[in-house]
């Protein structure tokens, strides 16, 4: 029986430790309206699980802040979008996470919706790799 308990605890520990909030590689789609097409690029962003809870009884004296895996530090990188008209600005600047943590989602700089457009959304039909 002790070996079963140990195995259960080990599996729980493994899930918590391995799926924590951390940097991960993602592919995002960038677009410039002036260029009329999209381009896929690789970037680093935060992904994983954070301990959170949703109270059954809402207490106004105790705010219910859900924690999410989000960036703690980020830098901006710039890529040149090919195929733009000569007068158009062909540079696209995007954020790249360098450090992650579990914290409150900042809606001023992050899409905090339950399901956003997603990193591969493109409003144009033509896609460049």
Curated annotation (Swiss-Prot):
Glycans are attached at residues 25, 42. GO terms for cellular component: cytoplasm; extracellular space; follicle-stimulating hormone complex. It is found in: Secreted. It comes from the Eukaryota. Pfam families: Cys_knot. InterPro entries: Cystine-knot_cytokine, Glyco_hormone_CN, Gonadotropin_bsu, Gonadotropin_bsu_CS. PROSITE patterns: GLYCO_HORMONE_BETA_1, GLYCO_HORMONE_BETA_2. GO terms for molecular function: follicle-stimulating hormone activity. CDD domains: GHB_like. Keywords: Disulfide bond, Glycoprotein, Hormone, Secreted, Signal. Residues 1-18 form the signal peptide. Its main location: secreted. Coiled coil: none annotated. Disulfide bonds join 21-69, 35-84, 38-122, 46-100, 50-102, 105-112. One of its GO terms (biological process) is G protein-coupled receptor signaling pathway. Heterodimer. The active follitropin is a heterodimer composed of an alpha chain/CGA shared with other hormones and a unique beta chain/FSHB shown here. Belongs to the glycoprotein hormones subunit beta family. Together with the alpha chain CGA constitutes follitropin, the follicle-stimulating hormone, and provides its biological specificity to the hormone heterodimer. Binds FSHR, a G protein-coupled receptor, on target cells to activate downstream signaling pathways. Follitropin is involved in follicle development and spermatogenesis in reproductive organs. This is Follitropin subunit beta.
